[in-house]
From Swiss-Prot:
Residues 48-65 have a biased composition (Low complexity). This is Sulfite efflux pump SSU1. Induction: Up-regulated by cysteine, nitic oxide, and in response to neutrophil phagocytosis. Expression is under the control of GCN2, GCN4 and ZCF2. GO terms for cellular component: plasma membrane. Belongs to the tellurite-resistance/dicarboxylate transporter (TDT) family. Residues 1-108, 159-176, 226-244, 295-312, 375-438 are cytoplasmic. Disruption phenotype: Leads to enhanced sensitivity to both cysteine and sulfite. Sulfite efflux pump required for the secretion of sulfite as a reducing agent. Plays a role in resistance to neutrophils during infection. Involved in transition to filamentous growth, which is believed to be central to the virulence of this human pathogen. It is a multi-pass membrane protein. The keyword Cell membrane applies. The chain crosses the membrane at residues 109-129, 138-158, 177-197, 205-225, 245-265, 274-294, 313-333, 354-374, 439-459. One of its GO terms (biological process) is filamentous growth of a population of unicellular organisms in response to starvation.
Amino acid sequence: MSSSSHNDNKIPPEKTTTPPLSSSNEDIYNPADSSNVLSSNQTLVSTNNNNNNNQNNNQNNNQNNDGKDTMDHLSYLSTIDSKRREQSYLKSFYQRFIIEDVVKNFTPAYFVSVMGTGISSSLLYNFPFPAYWLQICGYVMFGLTCTFFIGNIILLIMSCAYYPNRFRDYHVDPSRAVFMGAFSMGYITIVNFIALITKGEHIYFVWTLWWLAVFSAMYTSFLIVYLSFMSKLNESDVEAKLNATLLLPIVAITVVSSSGHSIELDLPHVHQTVLTMIVSFMLWSLSISMAFMVMTLYMGRLIIHKIPPTNLIMTSFLPVGFLGQSSYSIYLFGNNLNKFIPEELLYGKISLCLSGFVSVFLLSFGYFMCFVAVTSVLSKIRPFAKNPNPSHTNRFGLLKLEKSFWSMTFPMGTMSLSNTEIGHGGVGNYPLLTFKVMGSIFAAACIFITVGCSIGVVVYSFKKLREDMTNKNKYRNESMV
């Protein structure tokens, strides 16, 4: 009994069999299967989350690596820059400041300062309403002119010596080559002042200097204009650089023409006077023919593309310089013919009248271009400009004092010369006070702008020198620490 009951109480283990997937068409629910599915889904979700986390971590790592690479690159550049500064300050003052700063940044445009101071010295010495103290100021200004001229000549030679490619650029590149005309005109202003103070003495010395001026003017107006704008040596976009600065090499022959007319009557022999007179008139005719071609292109560009940008706005005064100087030259020619030809002949009077008409015609055009230039400058400053260019204007909306201000000096001076000469009343021996007053106004404007620009040059030079010495001392102190 006991054994049987004991055997009956034993429950055999249940055999659980998993039906095959193909046993029937119906789905059979099994809790174990659902738990397995849930666990597998959780596993997939966790796997996806891990993958997403890994991707995010990889992206963060990539971003961190990119940021690190950027920081490393910036630190590398700063290290290179600091090493360059360190190496530069290890050099001598001559190599560091003179060669790598002054000579490296030199351009022939610096000769515009010689033009401005040179014509200002002549205006001070021969002011429309003369005074002795003005003549003394003229001598001082002439000394400044010679200083600028000699300094720029030295920089020009050093620039071509240390940077040989620049000699080609000074003849081919339109943005640089045209300013070689400023070199010629600056030299001619020195010759003019020497002719004023010698008053006919040492005329052969002055005449020799004038022939050198003729050669330099012809060199710039022929060779440089051809190489920079007509030859195939220049592969740059000339149309983009076609502005009023192209007049600079051409105005040089106008200036040397008027210089010849101012000394021709002091020559002792008739054939020398006639030769100088004819050559000077030919130079004036050449400048008129070339300049009016350029003026046509310039006016067309001005009408189509409107006034120049702020950094080139001062070039609007360059046509004024050509018109004023050509007016002055042709009037001197007619006046000299009237004095040279005997009075019993009418040819001198006729030549004076014709030259006077042409001179007034050119002067009137000069007044118009002066109006265009002044209006163009005013349009770049407040209150006429709503949004002045911040890189060229100060916080008051006015133009900053820059090197381009030198472009105003010589044109104002030429307008003064022309007005003053007409005001002397050569035609009919009748002085014209109005033109003398206008000549005084233009002369005062030229002199004041020249003085301001000269002060700016001195201040800028001392500022650069002090900055170099300060950085040198700073580096020396850091290296000692």
